[in-house]
């Protein structure tokens, strides 16, 4: 796909629904008793994989674009799947679903695409095994396909080695089905959509700074869910409007969960012209409108407990940093190596091809700005949606057009991404 420079971006967008919240609303609706209605669901490939898996376990789910109805019959009515549960490209689907399957008294097999086959699963399967689930797979349960025989679980006090919402959620969802109280403690607080949404579905949890406890045996009750726009998708347009001259863009109803707004903190630190209007809706997940204009940016240091709040935004932050005065340092982000691709390597190699001055490090990268991006190269998403979108925005400011291979990867989380660039470019 050939993409070239854009003179300016103007107008407003409704960003598609948050991927994390869309996954959980379907899963928790499937576990609950009654009819769960979901508005502004993200119909991207990952979330559709979640729907397909729960349909294979006998759950009735109607999906019409971004409106979804889940008719749950309670956890005990989930049926043994006759076929493989295929999660596609979705790490969230597989890791959270393992927590649910761990407590179900049946056998299931879970696998996904080539990228999922390379992603580490032992960090999830080990605590679930300690609770009593029988899980096996390649390399002793490290890689898919995984075979799960669930059943009676005992509560656990689990110290997670990394701040990961997926690990935390898998253990909490198993804990919901276990005998006793399960506690998960993390080195830093990771995103808390699971805790907020379990509360919405009637489950009580105890939380402090870095740990969460859940009592086994609680029933979920159906809920009505409004899914705010995904801040990880919004980040690409926040960056685009900051970088493309003469731009002003408004993004409507974007999720502002504080465990996810690291990108906003970084943009402010870099000097972006950004206004936030939070809406007081009483929604479990806060959201609001973001207005951003072209800005002169300066370098930032990104590390420590900021990393879990913006791990998925690092590719687009790296692009921003190429246009910021000074050297931006990103560290403590080794988790990037086990994303859809090794994002430390793919971000550095693809941005270098178009003229960026960037050095990969063991746990992050150093980006020297401000550097004009020459473009005029063949680049690739490597099948990673966030790399594809980073390159789509990079093209807008490159001197020469670039040719993006595997652009369809963006459909994992943002099927209308390229159309939305065109929409804002037309208004300009």
UniProtKB/Swiss-Prot annotation:
Keywords associated with the record: Amino-acid biosynthesis, Aromatic amino acid biosynthesis, Cytoplasm, Transferase
Positions annotated as active site in the UniProt record: 312
InterPro entries: Enolpyruvate_Tfrase_dom (IPR001986), Enolpyruvate_Tfrase_sf (IPR036968), EPSP_synthase (IPR006264), EPSP_synthase_CS (IPR023193), RNA3'P_cycl/enolpyr_Trfase_a/b (IPR013792)
EC numbers on record: 2.5.1.19
PROSITE patterns the UniProt entry points to: EPSP_SYNTHASE_1, EPSP_SYNTHASE_2
GO molecular function: 3-phosphoshikimate 1-carboxyvinyltransferase activity
Localization terms from the record: Cytoplasm
GO biological process, one term: amino acid biosynthetic process
Catalysed reaction equations from the record: 3-phosphoshikimate + phosphoenolpyruvate = 5-O-(1-carboxyvinyl)-3-phosphoshikimate + phosphate
Claim: Cytoplasm is one of the keywords in the record: yes
GO cellular component, as recorded: cytoplasm
A Pfam entry, by short name: EPSP_synthase
Binding site for 3-phosphoshikimate: 19-20, 24, 164, 166, 312, 339
Gene3D superfamilies per the UniProt record, alphabetical: Enolpyruvate transferase domain (3.65.10.10)
Subcellular location, principal: cytoplasm
Pathway: Metabolic intermediate biosynthesis; chorismate biosynthesis; chorismate from D-erythrose 4-phosphate and phosphoenolpyruvate: step 6/7
Residues where phosphoenolpyruvate binds: 19, 91, 119, 166, 343, 386
Family: Belongs to the EPSP synthase family.
Job description of the protein: Catalyzes the transfer of the enolpyruvyl moiety of phosphoenolpyruvate (PEP) to the 5-hydroxyl of shikimate-3-phosphate (S3P) to produce enolpyruvyl shikimate-3-phosphate and inorganic phosphate.
Quaternary data: Monomer.
HAMAP family: EPSP_synth
NCBIfam families: aroA
Protein name (database record): 3-phosphoshikimate 1-carboxyvinyltransferase
Gene: aroA
């Amino acid at each position: 796909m050939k993409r070239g420079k854009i003179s300016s971006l103007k107008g407003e967008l409704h960003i598609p629904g948050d991927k994390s919240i869309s996954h959980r609303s379907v899963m928790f609706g499937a576990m609950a008793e009654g009819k769960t209605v979901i508005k502004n669901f993200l119909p991207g490939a990952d979330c559709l994989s979640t729907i397909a898996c729960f349909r294979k376990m006998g759950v009735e789910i109607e999906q019409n674009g971004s409106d979804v109805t889940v008719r749950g019959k309670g956890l005990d009515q989930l049926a043994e799947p006759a076929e493989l549960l295929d999660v596609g490209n979705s790490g969230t689907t597989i890791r959270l679903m393992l927590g649910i399957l761990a407590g179900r008294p049946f056998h299931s097999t879970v696998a996904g695409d080539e990228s999922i086959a390379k992603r580490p699963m032992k960090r999830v399967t080990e605590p679930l095994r300690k609770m009593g689930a029988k899980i096996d797979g390649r390399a002793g349960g490290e890689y898919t396909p995984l075979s799960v025989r669930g059943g009676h679980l005992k509560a656990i006090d689990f110290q997670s080695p990394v701040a990961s919402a997926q690990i935390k959620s898998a253990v909490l969802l198993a804990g919901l089905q276990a005998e006793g109280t399960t506690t998960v403690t993390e080195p830093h607080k990771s995103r808390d959509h699971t805790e907020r949404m379990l509360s919405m579905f009637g489950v009580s949890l105890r939380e402090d700074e870095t740990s969460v406890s859940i009592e086994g045996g609680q029933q979920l009750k159906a809920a009505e869910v409004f899914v705010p726009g995904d801040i990880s998708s919004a980040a690409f347009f926040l960056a685009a409007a900051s970088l493309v001259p003469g731009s002003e863009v408004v993004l409507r109803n974007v999720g502002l969960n504080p465990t996810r707004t690291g990108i906003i903190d970084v943009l402010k630190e870099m000097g972006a012209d950004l206004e936030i209007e939070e809406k007081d809706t009483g929604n479990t997940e806060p959201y609001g409108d973001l207005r951003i204009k072209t800005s002169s940016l300066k370098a930032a240091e990104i590390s420590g407990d900021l990393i879990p709040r913006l791990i998925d935004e690092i590719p687009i932050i790296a692009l921003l940093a190429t246009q910021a005065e000074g050297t931006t340092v990103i560290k403590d982000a080794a988790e990037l190596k086990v994303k859809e691709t090794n994002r430390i390597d793919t971000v550095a190699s693809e941005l270098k091809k178009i003229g960026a001055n960037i050095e990969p490090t063991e746990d992050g990268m150093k980006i020297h700005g401000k550097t004009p991006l020459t473009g005029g190269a063949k680049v690739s998403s490597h099948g990673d949606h966030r790399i594809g979108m980073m390159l789509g925005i990079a093209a807008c400011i490159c001197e020469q057009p670039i040719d993006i291979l595997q652009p369809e990867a963006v459909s994992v989380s943002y099927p209308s991404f390229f159309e939305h660039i065109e929409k804002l470019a037309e208004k300009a």
